[in-house]
Each structure stands twice: as C-alpha cells, then as structure tokens.
C-alpha cells in the first residue's frame, strides 16, 4: 500500500508518539517548521503534541498519543505524518491504532529510533510503505541539518527517486548480491515487537540495522535473540547503518555482525545513511531493494509512493 508523494502546498502533521517534547529544544522544531514553509509545505501540530504523562516518560498517555496518530490519518488535509523523535514508549500505542483507518487513508509516515516500532507495525498490519528518516528538528547538526538529508527529502518524497546515494564511501563487509524488502532499523525497537502480532515477517527481506550508544555485549545479545527468533533463516542480506557512539575501541559493530553470522554467508554492506545523527536517505520500509555488497550499491526496485 502506497501513500502519495509530497507536493508543494501539502500539509505535514507532526506528532509525538514517544518521548515528550522538550521546551528547551523548541528552536529545533521552529527551525524545522520554517524550513518546511520555505519548501512550500505547511505544518500542523497534533492536539496532544505538548502533553506529558505523570512520569515525564512519554508525550501523554497511550490513549492521547494513539488518538493523535488516528486523527492525523483521518484528516483529509494531512498528506504526511512525521514523528518528532524517538524515546521508549511508542509500543504503548500499538493496540490503540485504528489500522483499518490507516488502510483507508494511506499517508507518508516517518521517523526513526523508537518510531521504528510504528514503522514496522504499520507495515506489518497494513502493507503501508513507511519511511525511516530524521526527526523534525534543525539546529543541532543532527537531524534535517545535513545538505544530503535535505536533498533526499526532496528527491525521495517529492520526486520518488529510487537511488540510494552514498554520502561517503561504503564498505563491503561480506561479498554477494541479493534482493529483498527493507526491514529494520534499530534492534532494540525491532525486538520490542517480538512475540506480538506486530513483529515483522522477515521472509525474503534485507535487514537494515543501526545502533545507538550500544556496545559489543548488547549487540551480541540482540543478534542472539534474532537468531533464536529464526530471523536469520529468513533474511537474504544485511545493511549496517550508522552506529552512533558504539562503545568499543577494539571492535566495530559491522565486524561483530559479520563474525556472528559467518555460518549464513550473507552479503553485508556498511553504509552511513540511516540511523542516529548523520545524513538520511529516507529508507522506504517494506520496499524491495537490490543489494550488491561486492560493488557497494543499493537500488530500490519497488514503487514506494504514488
């Protein structure tokens, strides 16, 4: 199921389904809204955007956050839904999302980190292609600050370009070519769905993985969990993204993945265009891609927007 591409004059709805908005960082959101305005895009903030639960843990109750998701999908004037940021509690909204409403009103749905929970669940329940991308922030050189990200915001979401372009040189970790649908990206977020109806079907997929302030022990535990879930029996290859502040002077995340999965002999490619705090390629979650780890290329094969 495909959403419509963006056009000048469209309205983006911004929601906060995970961590609460921080007033001290308001300038980042203001800069983002101003940038969208300069691109001919209007912005609407959801009703419960500024809410916070009593623990200060989430941007309102699960009901408030789910209502904002459902309302944005119902709103005929909203063409895309972009999540403010990640955090921890996005999975609290899953049982409250009206997936039939989503099917009737397919829209661009975007975010990263804890928002991968929603990207994957929406794709699993409705087949909607969702997008792993930066937060709705400009001003700290972390999100929509990069020229590359601004370029691919336009080329992916307006022009529907199927190219995934390196922002710096990619590294072949294990040679090979394969095809499969993109599923990922943050292992903590993916594993929140384990044992639920929202867990992705990894059959014939390429697993995109990135970590945030992780370490070798944590990564090996997560890879073991995926192995016990049977994920590696289903996937066709792996693309490793940015591993922000990976806590090891001796080991790289991509080499740990390669060694752990040596028995499968997957094509594995290391890139830096998805994850935390670097340029973003706006990955279409659920779309089929051709991965050539040997020649260091990725090509989107499916249409991902109407």
Residue ranges of model-derived segments:
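Charged helix-capping and loop-helix junction motifs
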Residues: 28-31, 63-64, 221-226, 251-258
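ATP/nucleoside-binding phosphotransfer catalytic cores, i.e., glycine-rich phosphate-binding loops
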Residues: 242-306
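Active-site histidine-anchored catalytic micro-motif
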Residues: 58-173, 181
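ATP/NTP phosphate-donor binding region
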Residues: 1-77
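Short internal beta-strands
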Residues: 44-47, 111, 235-242, 269
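Structural motif
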Residues: 82, 110, 206-208, 239
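Buried hydrophobic positions in well-ordered alpha/beta secondary-structure cores of metabolic enzymes
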Residues: 14, 81, 114, 190, ...
């Amino acid at each position: 199921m495909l959403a419509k591409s963006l056009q000048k004059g469209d309205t983006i709805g911004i929601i906060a389904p995970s961590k609460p908005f921080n007033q001290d960082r308001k300038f980042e959101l203001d800069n983002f809204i101003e940038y969208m305005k300069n691109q001919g895009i209007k912005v609407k903030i959801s009703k419960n955007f500024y809410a916070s639960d009593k623990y200060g843990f989430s941007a309102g109750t699960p009901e408030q956050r789910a209502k904002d998701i459902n309302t944005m999908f119902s709103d005929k004037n909203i063409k895309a839904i972009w999540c403010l940021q990640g955090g921890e509690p996005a999975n609290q909204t899953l049982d409250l999302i009206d997936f039939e409403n989503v099917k009737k009103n397919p829209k661009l749905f975007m975010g990263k980190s804890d928002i991968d929970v929603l990207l994957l669940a929406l794709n699993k329940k409705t087949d909607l292609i969702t997008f792993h991308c930066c937060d709705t922030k400009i001003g700290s050189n972390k999100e929509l600050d990069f020229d590359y990200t601004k370029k691919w915001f336009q080329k992916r979401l307006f022009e529907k370009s199927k190219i995934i372009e390196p922002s710096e040189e990619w590294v072949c970790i294990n040679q090979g070519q394969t095809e499969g649908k993109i599923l990922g990206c943050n292992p903590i977020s993916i594993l929140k769905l384990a044992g639920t109806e929202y867990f992705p079907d990894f059959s014939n997929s390429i697993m995109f993985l990135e970590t945030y302030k992780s370490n070798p022990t944590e990564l090996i535990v997560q890879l073991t969990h995926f192995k016990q879930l049977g994920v590696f029996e289903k996937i066709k290859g792996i693309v490793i993204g940015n591993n922000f502040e990976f806590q090891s002077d001796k080991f790289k995340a991509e080499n740990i993945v390669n060694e752990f999965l040596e028995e499968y002999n997957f094509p594995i490619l290391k890139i830096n265009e998805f994850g935390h705090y670097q340029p973003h390629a706006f990955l279409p979650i659920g779309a089929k891609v051709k991965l050539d780890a040997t020649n260091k290329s990725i090509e989107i094969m499916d249409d991902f927007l109407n």
